[in-house]
Amino acid sequence: MRKEPRSIELLSPAKDLICGREAINHGADAVYIGAPKFGARAAAGNTLDDIRQLCDYAHLYSARIYVALNTILKEEELAEAEQMIWQLYEAGADALIVQDMGITQLNLPPIPLHASTQTDNRTPEKVRFLQEVGFTQVVLARELSLNQIREIAERTTVPLEVFVHGALCVSYSGQCYLSAALSGRSANRGECAQYCRLPYSLIDADGKEIVSGKHLLSLKDMNRGEYLEELLDAGVSSLKIEGRLKDVSYVKNVTAWYRKKLDAILARRPEYRRASAGHSTYTFEPVAEKSFNRGFTPFLWKERTKDITSFDTPKSLGEPVGTVKELKGNSFTIAGLKQLNNGDGLTFFNEKGELEGFRVNRVEANRIFTLDRPAIRPKMPLYRNFDQEFDKLLSKPSAERKLSVRMEFQDNAFGFTLSMTDETGARIMLTQPFEKEPARRDQAENIRTQLSKLGNTPFEAVEVTVAMSDNWFVPSSLLAEMRRQGVERLISTRRIRYRREEARPVKPCVGETLEIPFPEKCLTYLGNVSNSKAGAFYKAHGVTAVEDAFELSPRKDVPLMFTKHCLRYSMGWCPTYQKQKSPYKEPYFLCYKETLLRLRFDCKNCQMLIYAEE
């Protein structure tokens, strides 16, 4: 018996309605966007009306809209969150991405719930629990290797969502309390102050400086574009691009880049199918390196490697363009193959190791002119973090998404009939009364030409069949009107045919407690329980002791960050993977102004823990 192809989803970010529409245009199968409140990016909230408009637009292409409501909630916020969830459901949202298990205990509409990466999903046991209590998709921790992802997929059936591109949190998501402890701005409340991107000095127990003023907790950006097929074969169903604060150019370029890569795989792998309908065409060639990035890493893909960090800068480095060749006044030449343009932004690392940038004033042949001579020297690598010509292309309409449609034009006893059938099987038929008369010229070619004029619509004619009993005269005006009506009806039919997935409530029922036990018996502050309903959820699933969230009851001398990034390893002193021993005395500390952080190395679990020093 032939298996149904597995649905594969490209999931793009949107900070607002404009970004969301462009994500759809450029090939996203689904878009995730912030709720009006309670999203993990406090600066990326959206109105209900904008979310409604985005849902209407996406559903035309059978694409889905997931709304992020993935912060932990205070007791007094639960009623407002419940009301908002109903409003989001009525606006057309396809699913909610949540962190707080208290949400599962509210009076909810039948909207699917996705378990955010903030729920710390890194073991088969945790993912299986979420599956069994009713979550319909689970976002895995970014830190998981291919083998770990495969193991989870083999032991569960819930669709798995993984990040493939974008900024990396240095800590396990949902397990970072550094910002909350140092500033009162909690990452679990959507207000991360990004202490991980600051410059720190590394100091040993005797106060000796090992490294001075580097961004020692700053990671490169993830890029797993070359590994998509391996992820699909491991059991992943949703490929996620990070970036709910990124601008529309970023969303356009990165979405298109992954769409093209994914389409090439789907074209030769019939066991997988695209999750939405339509196809996109572009006015530009997508290049991931041309959008904001701190340098790329596949990030712990198969084994630990040294390529994950961005110690020199947390800013966008850009694409390599070559090295400085010859300097002359306010001009220079480059040894490299990239074509530079007037207005390009270039970056370089100065003699202090700091990132600097300058704007290209003009380019003449192979010589680049600047207004002021930057502090560059021969053989220095240069990068381009702003491509003027590329940005111009993206600032205009840069993609069209079309649904393939087949059209058939026939005569009947009363006039003419037009039928339209799109690629998903949606079909309409309309009849136009008309007093027929024989034509002097053949009409078939003009009928095909006029009916194919679908430019400003979501459709593209891939076939127009003319089947008339005689060569009747058909005015172009009549064809235009029938085409207009046909498009309107087909759009309406598609909207009516679209069916949202509905889910059963994620609630413990009588007798269900022991059947679906939570993998842990005791929850510390790491459980992020900030309201009574979340506590009730865990207790109903066999948890016997539940501590308050860090945000409710700040602790001293507890780990504030758990990270796979290890400074011992970065320095070459890892006792597991490296032979060299450190000449410095532990514990090590990170120092930034008045902030002092203590490091502890948990080699058994291959992670680094960070504490605040008083």
Predicted regions, residues:
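Short active-site loop/helix that positions an aromatic residue
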Residues: T104-P109
